[in-house]
Structure formats: structure tokens, C-alpha cells
Amino acid sequence: MKLLISPAKSLEFKKELPSKITTTAVFEKEASYINSVLKEKSPQHLSKLMSISEALAELNWNRNQVFKTPSDSTNSRAAIFAFNGDVYTGLDAYSLSEKQIEILQEKLRILSGLYGLLKPLDVIRPYRLEMGTSLKLDAHKNLYSFWKNKLTEQLNMELKEGELLVNLASKEYFSAIDEKAIQNTIVTPHFKDFKNGKLKIISFFAKKARGMMVRHLIEQNASTLEDIHSFTSAGYAFSSTETVDEMNPIFVR
């Protein structure tokens, strides 16, 4: 089983690390190339390109100027301990055991606008580049065009025969993969909450639940659809009545 999640805009580079083991991103050369393009953009251009404030644009301009591949130990860390959004709160990688981190490294992949595809322990530097950013790269009109074939081929290479690919990424990031060209079965869990008498996907809760699902599947060293269905964290439970397509299981609370 392989699991896919999105990165996070919020980063954490100061918290003490539970493990100093790191690996190297498979698309580090591509990350270096993309940064070389970003490096030429002024703070004003970055602000417009990324729809961010002047202060954030200045911060990321500075990040782009000092970006290095391969990363050294200065201001860099394993991706799973660097991203700090709702999904990562739900996962809580800092409290995983050494054995669970090994399973996480084998099963989890993080989609990234800059690095393409990351293993949890792949070392990264602080950056901001969402997959939906309209950044032109040579003949490619945007990041989707740049990454689609590369990411799809890499995933097909990593997936073993019969292995499930569990999509816990956002639509923005999963769209960077050519879903029809993936050779394995894709399972996309959905998380819904009752609100005002109706079942709805509430973004904050759904994101956190995706992270909790990752943790559940790591703790179980999961491999089957039944392992996915057994998820019960934070009051969620698999609903066979709400689930119409078994490749899109729905969890409710």
C-alpha cells in the first residue's frame, strides 16, 4: 500500500527532531531547476504570481536566494517534520515509533510543487510553491504540465503489483498525476460530518482526518481495503450506506 498526501504551506524548522535520519529526494535536480526560475522573480512578481502579501513575498524571495540542492544541515530537515498543516497535525509524526517511521518511509509519499514527490525522510529546505501556481518552465505552461509524466512514471515504478494507492491528497495536488495511467487501484477516502442535519465535507476536519487515516494505516501496517474501512479515529466510522463506490469509501461522524 502506498499513501499520497499534499504538503503544507505552514512550515516548522525549529522544533527538536525525533530522528536525524534523512534521505534524498528523487527529483532533487528538478527542484534545483525550478528554484533557478523562481530565483529570478522579484518579490513583487512573487506576490502577484502566488497571490501572497508583500511580507510573504519578501520571505520567499529570500528563501529562493539561499536555496541549495543537495541541502546541507543548515535550515533543512526531513519533509515529514517540516510540514505543519492540518493533515500533519492529524498524523502527528513526532510521536511515531522508530519502527513506525520506517513503515511511513516505505508507504507514504508527499506531493510537492517544488520537489515533485517526497518520501517522509527526504530532506527539504523552506519553500513556498503550490502545485496550482501558474509558473512557466521552458515548454511547460505550468507545474501540472511539468510534473504529470514524471510523477506518474515514478509512482508506477514504486507501486508493486496489486498494491493499493490511497489518495489522501487534495484535488489541487492529485491533479498533478495522470490518474488513468496509474496501473494500480486507487482508493480515495472521503470524510463527512453531520452539520445542521446534513452530511458535509468540512475542510478543516477532513484535512485532519486524512492525517489520522495515514497514522491508522501506518500503525496497522495496512495493505487491504478492509484495513482502510477499520479506521475509527476521532469518532469517524466507515459508512457502507453512504458509500456508493468502494474505491471512494465514505467515513462519517
Task: Annotate each PLM feature.
Residues 248:
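Acidic metal-coordinating catalytic centers involved in nucleic-acid phosphodiester chemistry
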Residues 93-245, 253:
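Internal, well-folded beta-alpha domain core
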Residues 4-95:
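Active-site helix-to-loop segments that bind/position phosphate- or nucleotide-bearing substrates
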